[in-house]
Curated annotation (Swiss-Prot):
Species of the source: Arabidopsis thaliana
Keyword hit for Isomerase: yes
Annotated spans, Disordered: 235-300
SUPFAM superfamilies in alphabetical order: Pseudouridine synthase (SSF55120)
Assigned protein family: Belongs to the tRNA pseudouridine synthase TruA family.
Protein name stated in the entry: Putative tRNA pseudouridine synthase
Pfam family, one: PseudoU_synth_1
């Protein structure tokens, strides 16, 4: 069996987007999608200051900044702070205290992140890790901030002194007041580390046999590349407009219609972007989907099915532009080894991802490889007329690797120059990845232990589809395809364009 080590983040220089070079400024930060923080009405008292005053800077003024952080999410209940239950450990809870102790938050603002304009790059669930999460806020800064330190590494190290070992601040950069990392992020890059035993690759396999299985798995993963409705890979209701919601009339006149349906859907999609793995009380049991397909029976009772084709519109289960996502890359790397466990690193790059989307993509691909689901299930599931229940893979080996931005062109905001991370920041990220993240993530690469053993056992028992339901879906898909012959030509053209957009060497996106 081939042996190598977990790869460290590749230093970034530039990133080629489909038609242009993405240009980002060091004054803004080159990584992250952001979801605005929801303000809490609960306020906290500042923590005891007995042991940190020597490490606390003196505030000179308040400035909007963007902080890049990395963390191992194993010991935390996700990123987002939980005001209702202070006993719940979160990344933001630790970070807020550390910034306060370093001098970045005033006593009067501590405990209310809304006051300081706190926004995050992702709301990761427990077990999800990151090397490229960004937090933006209006922070109290010292007079010497960024003097001979353009990446803000001195500020970063001061904050990191007050953080546990599994959370690290890499840089603190000044930000334009109008910079919106969520809206201006054009690419998000994730990695998923998958034990090869799950794919059926054994220690006794020859190199040729290993290459065959990985190549075959890549053919399955490539089916996800392109722009499709990924409604079967998330909780659909989270991305659906409320049909009962009424817009109040202004001055006795009906509200203005949006300029276009496309523009309206785009705005809704942006406002409802939920990063992969958002913290919530999971309703899944052992990886089962949390959203069933309901079919009315002849006696008006409800029957739960696992696969269905909608021959008629379902007003209670609409699919809109908010359910569409563009995936630029979904590929597996070669066999690697860490602590004696063989694994492959799956790279998933896209504009944005919905709740559970990546984990369901991985779970479905594994089920296809294990011959529990048919080869055409991915193609069928990416059609807006299908409703299919798909498996959800574990979260413990999902890592946010990086993001890219395209700064919006506004009259008061001139163009930005492209730069990569400084060598000092790259070194800090590499050190954290090797010394902290790798040892802790590697323990989840043992397919004979949790979470993989339970997940695979459940997958093998429960994730097949009823033949009659599947045949009905295929029949509906064939009729739909026959009615739209131009779709085949468009699909070919889209595939060629997508491949050309990622054919150039792509470095770690920041």
């Amino acid at each position: 069996m081939a042996v190598s080590f977990l790869r460290i983040p590749i230093p970034s220089r530039v990133f080629w987007y489909p038609t242009r070079l993405i240009r980002v400024t060091p004054a803004l930060l080159r990584f992250s999608s952001s979801a605005a923080f929801q303000p809490s009405s609960t306020s906290l008292s500042p923590p005891s200051s007995d042991n940190f005053l020597a490490d606390k800077w003196e505030s000179y003024r308040k400035k909007k900044v963007v902080i890049r952080i990395g963390y191992v999410g194993t010991d935390y209940r996700g990123l987002q702070i939980q005001r209702d239950d202070p006993s719940i450990k979160t990344i933001e809870g630790e970070l807020e205290v550390a910034i306060y102790k370093a001098g970045g938050i005033r006593d009067s603002n501590y405990g209310d992140l809304h006051k300081i304009g706190w926004a995050r790059s992702s709301r990761t669930d427990k077990g999800v890790h990151s090397l490229a999460t960004s937090i933006s806020l209006k922070m109290e800064i010292p007079e010497t901030a960024w003097k001979d330190d353009p990446q803000g590494t001195v500020l970063a190290k001061c904050i990191s002194k007050h953080l546990p070992e599994n959370i690290r601040v890499f840089s603190v950069l000044p930000s334009n007041r109008r910079f919106d990392p969520r809206r201006e992020c054009t690419l998000r890059k994730y990695s998923y580390l998958l034990p090869v035993d799950v794919l059926g690759i054994k220690n006794s396999f020859t190199s040729d046999e290993i290459d065959y299985h990985i190549t075959d798995f890549n053919e399955i993963l490539k089916e996800f590349e392109g722009e499709y409705p990924f409604h079967n890979y998330t909780q659909r209701s989270r991305y659906r407009r409320k049909s009962e919601q009424k817009i109040k009339q202004r001055n006795g006149r009906p509200p203005r219609e949006p300029k276009s349906i496309k523009a309206s859907e785009s705005e809704f999609r942006e406002e409802n972007h939920i990063e992969i793995g958002e913290e919530e009380e999971e309703k899944e049991v052992d990886g089962e989907s949390d959203e069933h397909v309901v079919t009315p029976d002849s006696d008006n009772s409800q029957v739960y099915s696992r696969a269905k084709w909608l021959y008629e519109p379902d007003e209670t289960d609409k699919i809109s532009g908010a359910h569409f996502r563009k995936v630029f890359r979904c590929r597996s790397g070669k066999l690697e080894n860490s602590l004696g466990f063989g694994f492959v690193e799956i790279s998933i790059w896209g504009e944005s991802f919905m709740l559970h989307q990546i984990r369901k993509m991985i779970g479905t691909a594994v089920a296809v490889k294990r011959e529990l689901l048919p080869r055409d299930i991915i193609r069928l599931s990416l059609n807006k007329f299908t409703r299919i229940v798909l498996p959800l893979a574990p979260s413990e080996v999902l890592i946010l690797r990086g993001n890219s931005f395209e700064v919006r062109r506004l009259p008061e905001r001139p163009g930005m120059e492209a730069t990569g991370e400084s060598e000092e920041v790259e070194k800090e990220i590499e050190e954290f990845y090797r010394a902290v993240m790798v040892p802790q993530v590697s323990i989840f690469l043992d397919s004979e232990k949790s979470p993989w053993k339970e997940w695979v056992d459940h997958l093998d028992r429960n994730d097949g589809l009823i033949d009659e339901e599947l045949e009905d879906v295929r029949k509906g898909w064939e009729e739909w395809k026959a009615a739209k012959p131009w779709m085949n030509l468009k699909k070919t053209e889209d595939d060629e364009e997508a491949l050309s957009s990622v054919s150039v060497p792509i470095h770690q996106a920041l």
